[in-house]
């Protein structure tokens, strides 16, 4: 373990120092043995910068005995509330309760989650009834493995003014990847009481090579800097210094930019000599150093650096030589930048270009899918050219040049694009109904999908609570009585597909179309699905089956029973769907899908059918034809339902 070696190195450094520093360490050690708690806050969720970046855990400390620490850096915690970070997303309140309740009675636990997706944010708050239990948990459970990850525990600090005080905060960089939070804590604990300790990691959990240690006093921080700065930790020389806030660092960078003396030159002729290089830039002022970068064969690589004695000379060289030709090549001459500066500028430039591109095509770029393989760019452009001027039309293809079944059409104005969406969505092209909509960025689509999932989960939960209380499920719009399928489960057309509102103006059941069933024959099996009514007969005359403890639906009028249809259509094509009014297509598809879903998953057939009905009509038609695809979608829906059940404690299907 790296922590043992690091601890030994730190201890050796302390032993070799003078008595003054030893006293500082002793006073810090005394504090560690006391029961005085420290205060800490949750980490900032911003991305950390590699060079003295914004601290991931800005914190405050508690006042201690004046004899040991002259200047306290914060105030004691006012409640027995602990922050628990670095948690696996699957960690729940129950898991944390089992761990922390072993220390003492827990008042409450809250895992913080995203407001939309309800996914864990990776941290939680644990509240004890008394401070002693909080102190004990902090001492005994810090860095305990929870689902394979070491947790990080600190006192919770809600006051932002205290949270952003950097007193006693130390920044360490050039760390070996093997050094983790615990190893860093063990190394620096020799210099004083540590309030928080964190090694920065990327999205995959790999160490970024830098971290932060927050001491409870400036003296402890100074001792750590004096002893460890420049030391070899795991054979790597580390830098240790006081943490500098991002705002301060940025102001220093701006000052350096305004008074730069170091100049970077590229696009130099590869035959240039050092004397020619010196003569070229020496005419603008005194040069303190210059470097013409060469390869292993001692041949110039085409770039170099010149450092002037003052800023005016450097600025003059940039003004005079930038974009000027020298030996047949146009030079680039500018202020020398560090790597992270260049990367930041490139990132900002890329984001700006991306934003401009998005704004340019906002509202004029269309996404078209469900295209036949034979439809090419020219055919796509011809079909959509009637609605305005097209700047581009592209079918997306794979590596072999085969169509992926979707493409994009870009117009010059939003009005043209909206007209095309209105006219072409669901229109038949080469035997398939098109899906046409405004193109959206992946992030927007993902956020919309997450919002839909959240709304759906909340609606299901409301239905479950209402059912448990004996309250009938809410129906949007003035619908007639529920029509039930085999086994007493509602047919989606009658409940509008999992609570989806009916189209305004259509208050009754959907109109009949040739060959379209509206309910299964009373008392008998569904046509083509023998034995599906094993749970009991469907009520005759289209009356809704009343479940125990439920009350009748409060619809404005009783809908007439729709006569049963003798058989299911063998094949329902896109042309058949096109003949159905648009507002009723979902209901038609729902009645066709429900028996197929019922065979695969009887208990959840109504919910799953409602979930499937949120798909585009073209994809629903494919599910009717392709049993394997339908099986896959049903399994996905069951997985979503199961995930929701797992995430909601006490919730049962």
From Swiss-Prot:
Keywords: Cytoplasm, mRNA processing, mRNA transport, Nucleus, Phosphoprotein, Repeat, RNA-binding, Translation regulation, Transport. PROSITE patterns: PABC, RRM. Pfam families: MLLE, RRM_1. Transmembrane segments: none annotated. Residues 80-158, 168-245, 261-338, 364-441 form the RRM domain. Residues 569-646 form the PABC domain. The modification Phosphothreonine is found at residue 167. Residues 1-10 have a biased composition (Basic and acidic residues). Residues 53-68 have a biased composition (Low complexity). Residues 1-77 are annotated as: Disordered. CDD domains: RRM1_I_PABPs (cd12378), RRM2_I_PABPs (cd12379), RRM3_I_PABPs (cd12380), RRM4_I_PABPs (cd12381). It is found in: Cytoplasm; Nucleus. One of its GO terms (biological process) is mRNA 3'-end processing. InterPro entries: Nucleotide-bd_a/b_plait_sf, PABP-dom, PABP_1234, PABP_HYD_C, PABP_RRM1, RBD_domain_sf, RRM2_I_PABPs, RRM_dom. GO terms for cellular component: cytoplasm; cytoplasmic stress granule; cytosol; nucleus; post-mRNA release spliceosomal complex; ribonucleoprotein complex. SUPFAM superfamilies: PABC (PABP) domain, RNA-binding domain, RBD. It comes from the Eukaryota. GO terms for molecular function: mRNA 3'-UTR binding; poly(A) binding; poly(U) RNA binding. Residues 17-27 have a biased composition (Polar residues). Interacts with cid13. NCBIfam families: PABP-1234. Binds the poly(A) tail of mRNA. Appears to be an important mediator of the multiple roles of the poly(A) tail in mRNA biogenesis, stability and translation. In the nucleus, involved in both mRNA cleavage and polyadenylation. Is also required for efficient mRNA export to the cytoplasm. Acts in concert with a poly(A)-specific nuclease (PAN) to affect poly(A) tail shortening, which may occur concomitantly with either nucleocytoplasmic mRNA transport or translational initiation. Belongs to the polyadenylate-binding protein type-1 family. This is Polyadenylate-binding protein, cytoplasmic and nuclear. It comes from Schizosaccharomyces pombe (strain 972 / ATCC 24843).
């Amino acid at each position: 373990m790296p922590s043992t070696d690091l601890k030994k190195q730190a201890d050796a450094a302390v032993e070799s120092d003078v008595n003054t520093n030893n006293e500082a360490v002793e006073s810090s050690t005394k504090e560690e043995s006391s029961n005085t708690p420290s205060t800490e806050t949750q980490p900032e969720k911003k991305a950390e910068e590699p060079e003295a970046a914004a601290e991931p855990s800005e914190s405050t400390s508690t006042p201690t005995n004046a004899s040991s620490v002259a200047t306290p850096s914060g105030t004691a915690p006012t409640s027995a509330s602990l922050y628990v970070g670095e948690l696996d997303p699957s960690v729940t309140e129950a898991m944390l309760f089992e761990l922390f309740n072993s220390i003492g009675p827990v008042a409450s636990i809250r895992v913080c989650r995203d407001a939309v997706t309800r996914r864990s944010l990776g941290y939680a708050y644990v509240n004890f009834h008394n401070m002693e239990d909080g102190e004990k948990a902090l001492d005994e459970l810090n860095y305990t493995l929870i689902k394979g990850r070491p947790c990080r525990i600190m006192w919770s600090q809600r006051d932002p003014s205290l949270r952003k005080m950097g007193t006693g905060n130390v920044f360490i960089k050039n760390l070996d990847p093997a050094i983790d939070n615990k190893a860093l804590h063990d190394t620096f604990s020799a210099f004083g009481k540590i309030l928080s300790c964190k090694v920065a990691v990327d999205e995959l959990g790999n160490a970024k090579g830098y971290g932060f240690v927050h001491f409870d006093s400036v003296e402890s921080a100074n001792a750590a800097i004096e002893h460890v700065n420049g030391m070899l930790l795991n054979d790597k020389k580390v830098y240790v210094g006081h943490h500098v806030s991002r705002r301060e660092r940025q102001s220093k960078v701006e000052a350096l930019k305004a008074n730069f003396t170091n100049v970077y030159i590229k696009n130099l002729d590869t035959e240039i000599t050092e004397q020619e290089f010196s003569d070229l830039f020496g005419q603008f002022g005194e040069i303190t150093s210059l470097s013409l970068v060469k390869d292993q064969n001692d041949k110039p690589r085409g770039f170099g650096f010149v450092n002037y004695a003052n800023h005016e000379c450097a600025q003059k060289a940039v003004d005079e030589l930038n974009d000027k030709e020298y030996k047949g090549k146009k030079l680039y001459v500018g202020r020398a930048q560090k790597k992270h500066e260049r990367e930041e500028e490139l990132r900002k430039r890329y984001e700006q270009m991306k934003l401009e591109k998005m704004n340019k095509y906002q509202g004029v770029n269309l996404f078209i899918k469900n295209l036949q393989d034979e439809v090419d760019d020219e055919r796509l452009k011809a079909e959509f050219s009637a609605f305005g001027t097209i700047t581009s039309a592209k079918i997306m293809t794979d590596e072999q040049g085969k169509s992926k079944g979707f493409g994009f059409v870009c117009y010059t104005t939003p009005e043209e694009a909206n007209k095309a969406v209105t006219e072409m969505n669901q229109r038949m092209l080469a035997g398939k109904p098109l899906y046409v909509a405004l193109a959206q960025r992946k992030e927007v689509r993902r956020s919309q999908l997450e919002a839909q999932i959240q709304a759906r989960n909340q609606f299901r939960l409301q239905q479950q609570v209402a059912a448990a209380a004996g309250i009938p499920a809410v129906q949007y719009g003035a619908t007639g009585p529920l029509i039930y399928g085999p086994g007493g489960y509602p047919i989606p057309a009658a409940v509008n597909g999992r609570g989806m509102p009916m189209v305004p103006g259509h208050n009754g059941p959907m109109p009949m179309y040739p060959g379209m069933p509206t309910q299964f024959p009373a008392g008998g099996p569904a046509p083509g699905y023998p034995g599906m009514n094993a749970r009991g007969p469907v009520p005759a005359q289209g009356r809704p089956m009343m479940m125990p403890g439920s009350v009748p639906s409060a619809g404005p009028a009783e809908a007439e029973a729709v006569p049963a249809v003798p058989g299911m259509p063998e094949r329902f094509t896109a042309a058949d769907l096109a003949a159905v009014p648009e507002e009723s297509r979902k209901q038609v598809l729902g009645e066709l899908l429900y028996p197929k879903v019922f065979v695969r998953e009887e208990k959840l057939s109504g919910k799953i059918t409602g979930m499937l009905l949120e798909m585009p009509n073209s994809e629903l038609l494919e599910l009717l034809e392709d049993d394997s695809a339908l099986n896959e979608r049903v399994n996905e829906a069951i997985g979503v339902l199961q995930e929701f059940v797992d995430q909601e404690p006490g919730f049962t299907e």
